[in-house]
Amino acid sequence: MEGRYKDYRIRFSPGWVEVVQDDVTVPSRRALITGATGLLGRAVYKEFKENSWHVLGCGYSRARPRFECLNLLDEAAVKALIQDFKPHVIIHCAAERRPDIVESQPELASLLNVVASENLAKVAAGVGAFLIYVSSDYVFDGTSPPYREDSIPHPLNLYGKTKLDGERAVLQNNEGAAVLRVPVMYGDVEKLSESAVTILFDKVQFSNKSANLDHCQQRFPTHVKDVATVCLQLTERKIQDPSIKGIYHWSGNEQMTKYEIACAMADAFNLPSSHLRPITDEPVGATPRPWNPQLDCSKLEKMGIGQRTPFRVGIRETLWPFLVDKRWRQTVFH
């Protein structure tokens, strides 16, 4: 579905100037992406854009020229933007996702993860937009995996609690909304520290120094482009079937500790891994994290929804621009 509008451009020639009117075709399906400047948000923005949606991306601290600068804590601004753009779907990617930061700044984290999500749910319901709230596997304590959508949540840390409270606020204020729980993600990062997965790469590359890595807590690293695909598929299914709502799970299916993730990175680039040391003791003084919050994704799988990128394939594509050994990069990729 597409719409047309008039656009104007100025054509310059020697001795004269002409104003030219063009017909411009734009998709009539509209998607609003919050947190569009973040790792997941960028992938979701790209996925909808490449599938003929008219996409408006919002950011705040990292807002850029092509994105709308929007403070999600400003209720009036959020309402005005949504009522003006009239999106068919809102993918709510914006969140404070770092557990340690949430513990140190609980009030601010609660405002963004809970209060802003509640307000967004209300406004989305008011304009009839389908809302997908991206949540986390940290709503579970990790003691009895795998977890289904109807498993009883029990977050161990404040981050997990704010995401769970955000889920409840969304579903209580927008009965047609969906919650998509996902695990730790990686993808086309702007810097290695943007993902809890890719941040390990420096420890892998600098093999002249031993590195201690957790070999206890289980993780399921998931590519953001796979999550973006699920968001698009779920949205397009909603258009056909209004009963699509409630909680869904999506996750990569390769189980790894941080130590195993680092070893897989080393293997992907033929780098040494003997300097990587597995630590099986529980971290002392760290923010508590679930041991194994594996998500059961069979609900979406039975619907024919989902995509999984093999970890070694995805991590190689993600990390090669950050290789210190440029000669290796040029040899393999060019």
From Swiss-Prot:
Cellular compartments per GO CC: methionine adenosyltransferase complex
Gene3D superfamilies given in the database record: NAD(P)-binding Rossmann-like Domain (3.40.50.720)
Domain of life: Eukaryota
Pfam families: RmlD_sub_bind
Example of a GO biological process term: S-adenosylmethionine biosynthetic process
Residues noted as binding NADP(+) in the record, renumbered to the chain: 37-40, 60-62, 71-72, 93, 97, 159
Region feature (Required for interaction with MAT2A): 319-334
GO molecular function: methionine adenosyltransferase regulator activity
Membership in a protein family: Belongs to the dTDP-4-dehydrorhamnose reductase family. MAT2B subfamily.
Protein name: Methionine adenosyltransferase 2 subunit beta
Natural source organism: Xenopus laevis
